[in-house]
């Protein structure tokens, strides 16, 4: 590896690397957000109680079957294959010329949605059943219970998994180069094809990928800590209040 070549590649092709990194982040952010929304909707639908008989039971069974097929298909096939099928398949079957970036957003979104659906469903199931029973006792239906009681807890609980999906998407967008999306990997291939210094070019790409994933991971951990709040609490006057240092010391002395 030549350090001089790395410096030269960065100086001559810096804008291409930055443009590719921006497209990677753009697709990852939008794809993760849309995928999370898809996952929330599917998670809520799949946890609707199925009655023992009636038309509602038949409808829910059909809908759950379709959603399960969607989840299994996109979780069970590689994203690179999905990209080829959706982009080239839509053009061949329906004569639709999809914009490459839009196709990338669509692929990442529906792929993430399949994974997030199971994460959300698991988060909903993990909520204490007593909360569902209490909501039902005061006359709430399933969607009111989800909106007012369950989902606020679920969103907090699935935040780490959502962050992991975001980091995975940053790396997995590299497969979109097969449909010529100008993300970081695609731009790096172009740079390496021009100077024939593949190792040095992709070393620069590695550094950029690491900077993005490392930074995003630290930001997400900071957000999680902020949401968790302080570690020490005391109960006073039926109110949950943050304990001050002197309060903790005083209580320790009393004990």
Regions inferred by a protein language model and the residue ranges of each:
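Transmembrane alpha-helices and adjacent helix-loop boundaries
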Residues: 1-255
């Amino acid at each position: 590896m030549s350090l001089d070549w790395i410096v030269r590649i960065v100086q001559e092709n810096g804008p291409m690397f930055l443009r590719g990194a921006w497209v990677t982040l753009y697709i990852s952010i939008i794809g993760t957000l849309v995928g999370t929304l898809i996952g929330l909707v599917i998670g809520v639908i799949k946890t609707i109680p199925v009655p023992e008989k009636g038309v509602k039971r038949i409808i829910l069974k059909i809908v759950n079957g379709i959603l399960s097929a969607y989840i299994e298909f996109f979780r069970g096939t590689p994203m690179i294959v999905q990209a080829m099928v959706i982009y080239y398949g839509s053009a061949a079957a329906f004569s639709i010329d999809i914009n490459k970036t839009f196709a990338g957003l669509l692929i990442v979104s529906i792929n993430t949605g399949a994974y997030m659906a199971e994460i959300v469903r698991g988060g909903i199931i993990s909520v204490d059943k007593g909360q569902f029973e209490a909501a039902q006792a005061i006359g709430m239906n399933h969607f009111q219970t989800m909106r007012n009681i369950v989902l606020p807890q679920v969103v907090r609980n699935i935040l780490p998994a959502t962050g992991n999906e975001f980091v995975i998407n940053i790396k997995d967008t590299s497969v979109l180069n097969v449909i010529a999306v100008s993300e970081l990997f695609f731009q790096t291939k172009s740079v390496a094809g021009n100077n024939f210094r593949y190792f040095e070019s992709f070393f620069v790409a590695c550094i950029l990928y690491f900077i993005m994933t490392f930074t995003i991971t630290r930001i997400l951990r900071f957000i999680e800590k902020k949401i968790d709040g302080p570690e020490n609490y005391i109960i006073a006057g039926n109110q949950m209040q943050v304990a001050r240092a002197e309060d903790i010391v005083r209580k320790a002395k009393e004990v």
